[in-house]
C-alpha cells in the first residue's frame, strides 16, 4: 500500500513500512506476574493439602483391598458391610435423630430470637447480640468440659438429653446470625403496610415476614443440622457408653483398629456435609436474587 508522504506542497521522503513484518517484543516477567504465579501455586497446593486426603479416603472406601494396597479394584463391599454393622447403624440413626431435634428446636428458638432483635429495642440488646459470637470462638474442648460440669450440677448428667441440649446450645447462635442477616435485607415497611390493612401480628409474621426470610430460615436450619450431626467433642463428653453418636463411635472404632468401613461411613458424612453447604450457598444466592 502506497503512503501519501505529501504535506501541502512539501514532499517528505519517508520509508514505506506498511509491509514491514512486525517483530514481537520479548516477554519479560514483572514482579507482579511472579507474585501472581506464586500465589496461584500456593492456592493449588493448599487445595490439594485440604482435599487430597478426602479423595484418597473416598477411593479407599471403594477399593477391594482392606490393606489400602494398589492397584485399585472397585468394589461396594465395604458399603454393604457398613449396612450390616449394627453398632454403626444404631449410632448413625441416633445422630440423625439428635440432629433433627436439634434442627427443630434451634430453628424455632433462633427465628423467635432473630425477630425479637429485629423488631424491638430493649436494654442489653447489643450485649446479647455480641454474646452470640463467643460460643463459636471458644474451643469445643472447653465448651464440652463446661457443659459436663453444668449438667451434672443441675442433675441431668450424661446421656442423649444432655447431648441434645448441648447441640442446641451450639447450633442456636448459627441460626440467629443467619436469620438475622436475612432480616437485615427485609423492609419493615412491608409489615407496616400489612398492619395498616388490618392484619394481626400473627398474620404478619406468618404471611409476610416468614415467607420473605424463608431462604435464611432454611439455611440456618441446615447449618444447625450440620453442626449437630458432625459434632464430636461435646458429644464425647456428654455421651453414655452404649448411647454414643456416630462421630464418637467412629473415633472408638479407629482406636480399636482402622477398617475400610470407617472410610465408607466417613465418605458418606463428607458427601452429606458438602451437599448441605452447597444447598446453603444456593439458598443464600436465591435469597439475594429475590
Which ranges hold each PLM region?
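Non-cytoplasmic
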Residues: 57-65, 175, 217-251
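Short membrane-interfacial helix/loop motifs at transmembrane-helix boundaries
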Residues: 7, 52-86, 236-241
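Transmembrane-helix boundary motif in ABC transporter permease subunits
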Residues: 27-31, 100-132, 145, 149, ...
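Membrane-interfacial helix termini and adjacent extracytoplasmic/periplasmic loops
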Residues: 22-29, 67-69, 76, 124-125, ...
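Transmembrane alpha-helices
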Residues: 41-42, 47-54, 144, 176-180, ...
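N-terminal signal-anchor/first transmembrane alpha helix
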Residues: 22-57
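Interhelical loop and adjacent transmembrane-helix boundary motif
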Residues: 8, 15-18, 27-35, 79-87, ...
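C-terminal transmembrane helix and the adjacent membrane-cytosol boundary/short C-terminal tail
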Residues: 2-22, 26-29, 38-39, 124, ...
Amino acid at each position: 500500500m502506497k503512503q501519501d508522504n505529501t504535506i501541502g506542497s512539501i514532499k517528505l521522503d519517508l520509508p514505506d513500512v506498511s509491509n514491514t513484518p512486525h517483530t514481537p517484543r520479548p516477554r519479560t516477567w514483572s514482579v507482579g506476574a511472579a507474585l501472581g504465579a506464586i500465589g496461584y501455586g500456593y492456592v493449588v497446593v493448599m487445595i490439594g493439602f485440604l482435599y487430597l486426603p478426602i479423595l484418597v479416603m473416598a477411593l479407599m472406601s471403594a477399593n477391594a483391598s482392606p490393606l489400602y494396597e494398589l492397584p485399585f479394584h472397585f468394589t461396594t463391599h465395604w458399603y454393604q458391610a457398613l449396612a450390616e454393622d449394627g453398632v454403626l447403624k444404631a449410632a448413625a440413626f441416633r445422630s440423625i435423630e439428635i440432629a433433627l431435634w436439634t434442627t427443630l428446636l434451634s430453628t424455632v428458638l433462633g427465628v423467635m430470637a432473630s425477630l425479637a432483635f429485629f423488631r424491638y429495642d430493649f436494654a442489653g440488646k447489643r450485649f446479647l447480640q455480641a454474646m452470640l459470637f463467643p460460643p463459636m470462638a471458644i474451643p469445643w474442648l472447653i465448651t464440652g468440659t463446661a457443659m459436663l460440669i453444668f449438667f451434672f450440677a443441675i442433675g441431668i448428667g450424661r446421656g442423649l438429653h444432655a447431648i441434645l441440649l448441648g447441640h442446641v446450645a451450639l447450633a442456636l447462635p448459627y441460626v440467629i446470625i443467619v436469620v438475622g442477616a436475612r432480616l437485615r435485607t427485609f423492609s419493615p415497611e412491608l409489615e407496616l403496610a400489612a398492619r395498616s390493612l388490618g392484619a394481626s401480628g400473627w398474620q404478619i409474621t406468618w404471611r409476610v415476614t416468614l415467607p420473605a426470610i424463608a431462604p435464611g430460615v432454611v439455611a440456618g436450619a441446615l447449618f444447625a443440622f450440620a453442626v449437630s450431626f458432625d459434632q464430636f467433642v461435646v458429644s464425647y463428653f456428654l455421651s453414655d457408653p452404649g448411647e454414643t453418636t456416630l462421630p464418637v463411635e467412629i473415633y472408638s472404632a479407629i482406636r480399636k483398629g482402622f477398617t475400610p468401613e470407617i472410610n465408607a461411613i466417613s465418605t458418606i458424612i463428607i458427601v452429606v456435609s458438602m451437599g448441605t453447604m452447597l444447598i446453603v450457598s444456593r439458598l443464600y444466592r436465591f435469597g439475594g436474587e429475590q
